[in-house]
Design a protein with these regions (language model features):
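Transmembrane helical cores of multi-pass ion-transport proteins
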Residues: 2-319
Length: 319
C-alpha cells in the first residue's frame, strides 16, 4: 500500500510544474494576432462558422434529450463557446452539452421527481454547481487521477446512455403522442410498443429520409456540416411539399426577447437537493472532456494539460 501512495506522490510531484493553472491563458492566443492578424482572423472565422453550423442543431437535440426547451441547448452551446476559450490552453477540448450529460441531467431530475416549471427553475443552479465542482477539482488536480478510472466503465455508461437516448427519442421519430412515463429503457420500449398502432406515417417518412440523407452525406462528404445540411434540407422540403395539412409536430418558436440574464435561486434546500446530481454530472464532464481531449491531442502528438482543461470546462458551466 505504501508503494502505491509513493507512486502517486512521485507522479503528482513530476506533474506539478506542468499542471500550474493559468486563469487567463487567452492572452497568449491574442499575442499571436498581433503578429498575423489577417491570417489568424481568417482561419478562426472559417472554423467558427463550421463549428456553429454543427453546434446549432446539436444544441437543440441535446436540449430535447434533457427534456428542456430547445433554446436552452442553443444558449448553452453559445455561452460555452464564448466563455471557455478565455480559460483554455488547448485546442482539443470539446465544450457545450453532450449526449451523456443530457441523459444524466434528465435522469437526475426524474429520480428526484422534479419536472415542468420546477425543473426549469432549478437547471441554472444545477449547472452552476457542476461548474463550481469542476473548477474546485481542477484546483486540487483531480485530473491527475482520472487515468485510474477503467475505460470499460466509461464505455459502458456511454453505451447505456446511447440506448436510453434512442428509446426516449423514438416516440418523436414515429410521431407518437405518449405520456412521459418511461424513465427506464425497458419502460420506454414497453410504452412505445403499446401505442405502435397509432404511428404517424408522415413523421416516420421524414425520420427515415433524414437518417438516409445523414448516412449518405457522412459517407461522401465528411468535411461538410452534415447535421446542419440535413436539418435545413429536410425542414425546407417538408415545408415545401407537405404544408400544414400533414399534421407533423413542430418545435415551438424561440423568442430571444424572453431571454434575460439573472442569477439562479441559491436557496440552501435546493443546493442540498442538487448536490449529489451536480457532483455526478461534474465527474462525467471531467471524464468526457479529458478523454476526448487526450484522444484528439494524441493524433497530433500534442500534450493536454488536463487540469487547465477542467478550468475551461468548469467556467463554461458557471457562465
Amino acid at each position: 500500500m505504501s508503494g502505491i501512495f509513493q507512486y502517486i506522490k512521485q507522479t503528482a510531484s513530476a506533474a506539478k510544474d506542468y499542471n500550474i493553472l493559468d486563469f487567463f491563458p487567452l492572452r497568449k492566443s491574442l499575442a499571436g494576432y498581433q503578429r498575423d492578424f489577417k491570417g489568424h482572423l481568417s482561419g478562426d472565422t472559417r472554423a467558427g462558422v463550421n463549428v456553429a453550423l454543427l453546434a446549432f442543431p446539436q444544441g437543440m437535440a441535446y436540449a430535447l434529450i434533457a427534456g428542456l426547451p430547445i433554446e436552452y441547448g442553443i444558449y448553452g452551446s453559445a455561452v460555452a463557446a464564448m466563455v471557455a476559450p478565455i480559460f483554455a490552453k488547448s485546442h482539443y477540448i470539446t465544450l457545450g452539452p453532450t449526449n451523456a450529460t443530457s441523459v444524466m441531467l434528465l435522469s437526475a431530475f426524474a429520480s428526484l421527481g422534479i419536472a415542468g416549471p420546477q425543473m426549469l427553475s432549478l437547471v441554472p443552479l444545477l449547472i452552476l454547481m457542476v461548474g463550481l465542482f469542476v473548477v474546485i477539482g481542477a484546483y486540487f488536480k483531480v485530473a491527475n487521477f482520472v487515468q485510474y478510472i477503467s475505460r470499460s466503465v466509461i464505455t459502458g455508461y456511454i453505451t447505456a446512455a446511447a440506448l436510453l437516448i434512442i428509446a426516449n427519442q423514438l416516440p418523436k421519430a414515429l410521431g407518437l403522442s405518449l405520456p412521459r412515463k418511461g424513465a427506464t429503457f425497458y419502460d420506454s420500449l414497453t410504452l412505445i410498443s403499446s401505442h405502435i398502432d397509432t404511428l404517424h406515417w408522415t413523421t416516420v417518412g421524414i425520420s427515415l429520409a433524414t437518417m438516409a440523407l445523414y448516412i449518405l452525406l457522412n459517407r461522401c462528404c465528411k468535411t461538410l456540416p452534415n447535421v446542419a445540411i440535413c436539418l435545413i434540407a429536410i425542414s425546407a422540403s417538408s415545408a415545401l411539399f407537405l404544408g400544414p395539412t400533414a399534421n407533423v409536430a413542430l418545435l415551438s418558436g424561440i423568442n430571444a426577447a424572453d431571454w434575460s440574464l439573472q442569477l439562479p435561486s441559491l436557496a440552501w434546500s435546493d443546493i442540498q437537493l442538487l448536490a449529489s446530481p451536480a457532483l455526478a454530472i461534474a465527474l462525467l464532464c471531467i471524464l468526457e472532456g479529458i478523454s476526448i481531449g487526450k484522444s484528439l491531442a494524441a493524433k497530433t502528438g500534442a500534450r493536454l494539460n488536463a487540469n487547465q482543461a477542467m478550468i475551461s470546462i468548469g467556467m463554461a458551466n458557471i457562465g
